[in-house]
Amino acid sequence: MRILLTNDDGIHAEGLAALERIARTLSDDVWIVAPETDQSGLAHSLSLSEPLRLRKISDKHFALRGTPTDCVIMGIRQVMDIKPDLVLSGVNSGSNVADDVTYSGTIAGAIEGTMQGVRSFALSQAYLYEDGARIVPWEVCETHAPALLEKLMDLDLPEGTFLNLNFPNCRPGEVDGAEVTMQGKLAFNLQVDARSDGRGFPYYWLKFGERAGAFIEGTDIHALKHNKISVTPLKLDLTDYSVTDRVARALGYGAQV
């Protein structure tokens, strides 16, 4: 089995090293095409206004000046001579749950793999932020991901569907199993931090405020809060079929499929 790895935290990220160790429990044929620099929050974006620069680190390790989406395309279309059987994106430093999935470059890696016709998984590890530092328990995903992936790899998923795996912030022995979940809802409360440079010109940082949400049973955020691994099936089709008829009636058309 051929496995292609990517991430959004960059080629030197601890989570990518963890993902490689996870992948090597499944196969010896592991390839990496990951961003040269941190691409967090770039979602499913493409580099269209500048060239992609590929740097070979070793026979199956490459760094790309591009987004996670670019990396998967380059891996499948340029770097690998034979299409991979599996795309793994991650392991992200921090969970990708609720509305996070719309911003996430980690999720985008799995989206692009799915669009390329390859079974794909996104993996993310929740962490504790304490005294201005991230404390990421990588051993949780490394302990539990291999067996989980073994069970899920041969699952007959519909076309256009991939799985989003999130690992809780706890010790490996405290994980209370895995739960199939749906997306929860968290308010991002993004704020703008306005500053001035040395010449008095303004510049801005986006920063996160307090995140609030309803930890409803069955959601990804509820699972993580209760030390469970969340497994959320996501699909590329964003159509809201529940309102198509209402929209059609508002426009004076008949019922839609």
Curated annotation (Swiss-Prot):
Binds 1 divalent metal cation per subunit. Its cofactor is a divalent metal cation. A divalent metal cation binds at residues 8-9, 40, 92. It is an enzyme of class 3 (hydrolase). Its EC number is 3.1.3.5. It is found in: Cytoplasm. GO terms for cellular component: cytoplasm. It catalyses: a ribonucleoside 5'-phosphate + H2O = a ribonucleoside + phosphate. Keywords: Cytoplasm, Hydrolase, Metal-binding, Nucleotide-binding. The keyword Metal-binding applies. InterPro entries: SurE (IPR030048), SurE-like_Pase/nucleotidase (IPR002828), SurE-like_sf (IPR036523). Belongs to the SurE nucleotidase family. Nucleotidase that shows phosphatase activity on nucleoside 5'-monophosphates. This is 5'-nucleotidase SurE. The lineage of its organism: Bacteria, Pseudomonadati, Pseudomonadota, Alphaproteobacteria, Hyphomicrobiales.
